[in-house]
């Protein structure tokens, strides 16, 4: 029914098992297993007498090897956990690709992540918030190899100990950590081939003694690929310009190289106090070359205009972070109060160089070179304290506070070269600065009484932001908001459990969404932030039923005021250039039904099925276009796991996304099938994995956006069908020790929430 671990003195506590008859089994390495007689657990709980284990009589115990394989997916009332490390499908993949195959996770044409059909997702990596959105976040996750990831937690209703940011929820990414005693490590390498090659290699080392643990890891990625983009655009007539249309074909080559690393130590100062420190970094360089061929037709009576553009971009992103944390228990027992302190600093730097050549077929339109040099820095500092106090009757009170400060600077210079003459383009060259301070405090009560589990919390966040441009234009926001959260779970019988989830959350505009400076894709398309964006707030409600602790049915509703959405519109500069940016609409109403079924079809075949059926309705106005429409959509995920003879493991993953009406867009259906096998070698110290992603090449993106003044049909295909081979070798001591949790930023609160 349940498994728990004792503390250092052998004390343990098992929650959520009231009102039934049980047997208790106790085991420890070097001792014989102990079984109690049958006993009942009343609503008030039961205290067992002292249990003594008898040592084994074996004169010498050489080695005990404990083997186990986690299921690919684990479902809980407020989250789904994706166990990435043991999956043959993760070999050679990126973290973004693994997310795209996870139940309920999708990406749109602009690389915005959605969780259960809703945008506005907050991403953590080892407890550190990633302050990026859109294609910047997608590029970051592309640069992070999936071989370094242990698990993903898709949390739709986080407790009060989490930041309130993210109206759709939280994606918590946990990286691998070695828990073995002594000196241990692993080496891995993979090579994949689609139309272009993809290489990943890595090394991890860990030295653990009684009071000290030193660890480090490094990974290098070299991935080449392509993207094909086709656009059909229709511009309606305005008082300034006649109606027009264009057809554009883009062929893009990409070359991404990244270095990922982390070093740290955990030090046991005494039996109650643990100190940890770590430094990590992810440095990437992405080279892209894009050739665009386009045809413009102003109206039927004029000749068409043709142009070809060549765009070369060199984007460098050296990112680094540091963490110092301390955990102290105020007594030696498992019921002692504890305090965790964290200090974090992170720096995200971006250099973006652009060279955009445009050649026209018209003699009166000379060749033009647009060159750009954009440099940005994002500095984040955070201090955090979490206190936990166990209470009588198996309850616990938690409280904490957090202070975060963000400083962002951006400087971009564009120059035009025509007929050999170069001039600075002052209209699109500028500087931008952004400051943000969030002060937060929370209280959370957790307890189980007579078959009812309660988790009730309240979080307060006070936000102060200021945005400044080069012309001294400044905007400030100051506000205080409260964010209640509730998890109420009632065990009706051995087979039936009901859970109610309620939460209020916020979506503050990210720095990149406010930054008005431009990033050009080609001669007719650029991306820019919107300084007029305001924060969105959401009220989320969910009622779920679980049958036999496996089969889950959930009904949910969410209302979001002033939701932030991504749109494509003609540039305010005029002409036939379009801008990709974010705007606020009035409201979003979201209704969803989620069905989850983990099925053990045979001893060697396990099927995890997840069905998401939802209705999404938006209301608002943009560029004279009134919007009040919605549509039904479906997202299906099937994952088959096979444990085969001869130490073989196989997986087949398939997902399907139906046609969807989303904001101003109509998104066509798509799907993907990925297969993989894994073989253990060298006495299970090594493994060989082989997988093929997007077997049937069925995951293109086809979107039509319709406004009163503009229509765009968009088609995108990437280098997604890839065959990959991977080899991993593990060396060192096989004995496992209890790992010290490296609490970085919010990592301790993530761990604590996941155990509830």
Feature annotation, model-predicted:
Residues 25-31, 45-89, 108-110, 116-120, ...:
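Short, acidic, small-residue-rich periplasmic hinge/interaction motif at the N-terminus
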Residues 260-284, 309-468, 550-554, 589-614, ...:
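Face-selective signature of the C-terminal outer-membrane beta-barrel domain
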Residues 371, 380-384, 423-430, 534, ...:
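Outer membrane beta-barrel strand-and-loop segments of large Gram-negative receptors
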Residues 96-133:
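Extracytoplasmic beta-strand/coil segments of soluble accessory domains associated
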Residues 47-52, 95-98, 137-140, 154, ...:
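N-terminal periplasmic accessory domains that precede
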Residues 128-156:
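Short acidic/polar hinge/loop motifs at secondary-structure boundaries
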Residues 464-465, 494-540, 555-575, 695-708:
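Surface-exposed extracellular loop regions of Gram-negative outer-membrane beta-barrel proteins
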Residues 1-11:
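Short, acidic Ser/Thr/Gly-rich low-complexity loop/linker segments typical of extracellular
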